[in-house]
C-alpha cells in the first residue's frame, strides 16, 4: 500500500483564466478539427464531441440529429445486425461519417461487429467499451480488433492513467477513452472506492497519448458547456457526453408519467436497470454500479447541441483561441472554491 500525495482535480475545482483576445465575435471561432489517426491512417474532420454509447443516449435517432452539427455518436452495442441494416439503408453518407460502432469484448460481440462493419464501408469508427480497461483480456481484444480491422479507427477504454493509455495505443487503439466514475449516473466510485478526478485524468492521459501519436476522449464528468471547454483545455482531443444529451426526443429512454408530467428514464450501463434489460438481471457475483434517474423531457437535442457549441465558442473567445485546436495551448487553469453565484438556483 502507498499514498500518492499529488493533488488531483475535477472540473469543479478550476476555472479557465481569461486572456487578451483579438477575436471580434464568437462567430470567428472554428470548432471543426481535422485528425489523421495513428493506426488506421484515416482522416476525419468535424466537431470532436461524441454522444455516449449508452442505450438512452447513443441511438440511431441521436446520430441523425447530431450529424447535422458535425458531432459524432457512439451508437450503443445493443442494436441487432438487422436494425443496423435498416438504419444504414436510410442514412446518408454524411450521417455514417459521424457514427461509431460500439462493441464489448466477448466473442459474440466481436462476431456481431464483424457483421455490422461489413454492411457499409463508410462505417469507419469502432468503439470498444468496458468499464475497466486495465485487464489483460481487454488489451488483447484491442490488439485482435486492430488486426481484424487495420483501416478502422479504434476508440478503446476506459482508463485514467498514462501508462495504461500508452499500453492501449501500442496495442492498436487510435483513441483512448478516459474516465472511471465521473458520469452522472455512474456509482463506481461509491461502490468500489476506485476512480480518478476527471480533469487530472485528462491532463495526464493526454500527455501520455500525444507522446505516442495517439489521442484521447474525455468520457464523463461534464454537467454544463463550461466543463466541455475545460476538458478540451486540459488536452482532450474529443469529449464524450451522456447526461447532457439524455432526456431528449432522440435519446431513446422510456417515458413515464407522474402527476400529469412526463419524464424520460436515464440510467448507467452498469445499473440494475441496464442489466435487467440486456442480460436478465444483476449476476450474483457483482453489484450494480449505476443508477436510474427520471429526467423532465427536454425536447429536441438540437437546442442543447447549439447551447454546448455556443458555450465552447465563447470559451475560445475569452482566451483568444480562433480555433478549437488552439484552446489547450491558451488555457491556464486557476484553482477555485466556487464556480457560480447560486442564490437563485432553487427558483
UniProtKB/Swiss-Prot annotation:
InterPro entries per record: Aldolase_TIM, GMP_reductase, GMPR, IMP_DH/GMP_Rdtase_CS, IMP_DH_GMPRt
Similarity field: Belongs to the IMPDH/GMPR family. GuaC type 1 subfamily.
Disulfide bonds, paired cysteine numbers: none
Gene Ontology cellular-component terms listed: cytosol; GMP reductase complex
Highest taxon of the lineage: Bacteria
Role noted for this protein: Catalyzes the irreversible NADPH-dependent deamination of GMP to IMP. It functions in the conversion of nucleobase, nucleoside and nucleotide derivatives of G to A nucleotides, and in maintaining the intracellular balance of A and G nucleotides.
Protein name per the record: GMP reductase
Gene3D superfamilies assigned: Aldolase class I
Alphabetically ordered keywords of this record: Metal-binding, NADP, Oxidoreductase, Potassium
Lineage: Bacteria, Pseudomonadati, Pseudomonadota, Gammaproteobacteria, Enterobacterales
Alphabetized GO MF terms: GMP reductase activity; metal ion binding
Residues holding K(+): 181, 183
Record carries keyword NADP: yes
Parts forming coiled coils: none
SMART domains noted in UniProt: IMPDH
